[in-house]
Regions:
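Acidic/His- and Gly-rich active-site-bordering loop/insert found
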Residues: 2-97, 101-126
Length: 126
Protein backbone atom coordinates (compact mmCIF):
# COMPACT_ATOMS: atom_id res chain seq x y z
CA UNK A 1 0.00 0.00 0.00
CA UNK A 2 1.25 3.47 -0.89
CA UNK A 3 0.96 6.42 1.42
CA UNK A 4 -1.35 9.23 0.37
CA UNK A 5 1.75 11.39 -0.18
CA UNK A 6 3.29 8.78 -2.48
CA UNK A 7 0.05 8.48 -4.41
CA UNK A 8 -0.17 12.26 -4.77
CA UNK A 9 3.44 12.49 -5.95
CA UNK A 10 2.62 9.93 -8.62
CA UNK A 11 -0.64 11.46 -9.87
CA UNK A 12 0.03 15.19 -9.52
CA UNK A 13 1.80 15.67 -12.87
CA UNK A 14 -1.22 14.23 -14.69
CA UNK A 15 -3.69 16.25 -12.59
CA UNK A 16 -1.75 19.47 -13.14
CA UNK A 17 -1.65 18.80 -16.89
CA UNK A 18 -5.42 18.17 -16.91
CA UNK A 19 -6.11 21.34 -14.91
CA UNK A 20 -3.89 23.46 -17.17
CA UNK A 21 -5.58 22.00 -20.25
CA UNK A 22 -9.02 22.87 -18.85
CA UNK A 23 -7.78 26.37 -18.01
CA UNK A 24 -6.75 26.85 -21.63
CA UNK A 25 -10.11 25.55 -22.96
CA UNK A 26 -12.79 27.34 -20.89
CA UNK A 27 -16.47 26.54 -21.36
CA UNK A 28 -19.53 28.39 -20.07
CA UNK A 29 -22.05 26.73 -17.75
CA UNK A 30 -24.01 23.82 -19.21
CA UNK A 31 -21.58 23.77 -22.15
CA UNK A 32 -18.66 22.06 -20.37
CA UNK A 33 -18.59 19.04 -22.68
CA UNK A 34 -14.82 18.98 -23.20
CA UNK A 35 -14.14 19.56 -19.49
CA UNK A 36 -16.58 16.81 -18.56
CA UNK A 37 -14.86 14.44 -20.99
CA UNK A 38 -11.46 15.15 -19.38
CA UNK A 39 -12.87 14.46 -15.91
CA UNK A 40 -14.48 11.21 -17.08
CA UNK A 41 -11.22 10.09 -18.68
CA UNK A 42 -9.41 10.57 -15.35
CA UNK A 43 -12.12 8.71 -13.43
CA UNK A 44 -12.17 5.85 -15.96
CA UNK A 45 -8.39 5.52 -15.87
CA UNK A 46 -8.55 5.16 -12.08
CA UNK A 47 -11.48 2.73 -12.23
CA UNK A 48 -13.74 5.06 -10.27
CA UNK A 49 -17.43 4.48 -11.06
CA UNK A 50 -19.45 7.49 -12.16
CA UNK A 51 -22.78 8.42 -13.66
CA UNK A 52 -24.22 11.34 -15.60
CA UNK A 53 -26.21 13.92 -13.68
CA UNK A 54 -27.86 17.15 -14.74
CA UNK A 55 -26.76 18.24 -18.19
CA UNK A 56 -22.96 18.24 -18.02
CA UNK A 57 -22.46 16.91 -14.50
CA UNK A 58 -20.88 13.75 -13.16
CA UNK A 59 -21.46 11.89 -9.92
CA UNK A 60 -18.56 9.71 -8.80
CA UNK A 61 -18.54 7.53 -5.70
CA UNK A 62 -15.77 5.94 -3.69
CA UNK A 63 -17.47 3.24 -1.63
CA UNK A 64 -15.62 1.53 1.21
CA UNK A 65 -18.20 -1.26 1.23
CA UNK A 66 -18.70 -0.68 4.95
CA UNK A 67 -21.55 1.19 6.60
CA UNK A 68 -20.81 4.69 7.69
CA UNK A 69 -21.32 8.32 6.84
CA UNK A 70 -21.58 9.64 3.33
CA UNK A 71 -19.40 12.65 2.60
CA UNK A 72 -20.26 14.81 -0.38
CA UNK A 73 -17.67 16.85 -2.24
CA UNK A 74 -18.53 19.17 -5.10
CA UNK A 75 -16.61 20.95 -7.80
CA UNK A 76 -17.67 23.18 -10.62
CA UNK A 77 -16.58 22.98 -14.26
CA UNK A 78 -17.76 26.25 -15.76
CA UNK A 79 -15.88 29.36 -16.77
CA UNK A 80 -17.35 32.85 -16.79
CA UNK A 81 -17.53 35.51 -19.51
CA UNK A 82 -14.37 37.62 -19.19
CA UNK A 83 -13.63 40.00 -22.02
CA UNK A 84 -9.96 40.63 -22.71
CA UNK A 85 -8.58 37.69 -20.72
CA UNK A 86 -5.60 36.12 -22.53
CA UNK A 87 -7.15 32.64 -22.30
CA UNK A 88 -10.74 33.65 -23.03
CA UNK A 89 -12.37 31.50 -25.69
CA UNK A 90 -12.92 33.33 -28.94
CA UNK A 91 -16.54 32.28 -29.38
CA UNK A 92 -17.93 32.95 -25.87
CA UNK A 93 -15.25 35.07 -24.13
CA UNK A 94 -15.31 32.44 -21.35
CA UNK A 95 -12.27 32.30 -19.09
CA UNK A 96 -11.42 30.48 -15.88
CA UNK A 97 -11.11 33.61 -13.78
CA UNK A 98 -13.18 31.88 -11.09
CA UNK A 99 -10.73 29.05 -10.39
CA UNK A 100 -13.04 26.15 -11.17
CA UNK A 101 -10.28 24.43 -13.15
CA UNK A 102 -8.35 24.38 -9.87
CA UNK A 103 -11.34 23.03 -7.93
CA UNK A 104 -11.54 20.15 -10.37
CA UNK A 105 -7.82 19.47 -9.99
CA UNK A 106 -8.10 19.36 -6.20
CA UNK A 107 -11.15 17.09 -6.34
CA UNK A 108 -9.49 14.68 -8.75
CA UNK A 109 -6.37 14.68 -6.58
CA UNK A 110 -8.46 13.70 -3.54
CA UNK A 111 -10.36 10.96 -5.37
CA UNK A 112 -7.29 9.49 -7.04
CA UNK A 113 -5.06 9.68 -3.96
CA UNK A 114 -7.65 7.89 -1.82
CA UNK A 115 -8.08 5.25 -4.52
CA UNK A 116 -4.40 4.80 -5.45
CA UNK A 117 -3.10 4.75 -1.86
CA UNK A 118 -5.46 2.00 -0.73
CA UNK A 119 -6.69 4.32 2.02
CA UNK A 120 -10.31 3.48 1.17
CA UNK A 121 -9.99 0.11 2.95
CA UNK A 122 -9.33 1.97 6.21
CA UNK A 123 -12.43 4.15 5.85
CA UNK A 124 -16.14 3.46 6.19
CA UNK A 125 -19.10 4.82 4.27
CA UNK A 126 -19.00 6.54 0.93
Amino acid sequence: MKSVHEALDQILPEIIAMSEDIYCHPELGFKEFRTRKKAIEALDKAGIPHEDVAYTGIRAVLDSGKPGPNIGLITEFDAVPTFGHPYASEDSCAAHTCGHYGQLGVMMSLFLAIRESGMLKDLCGK
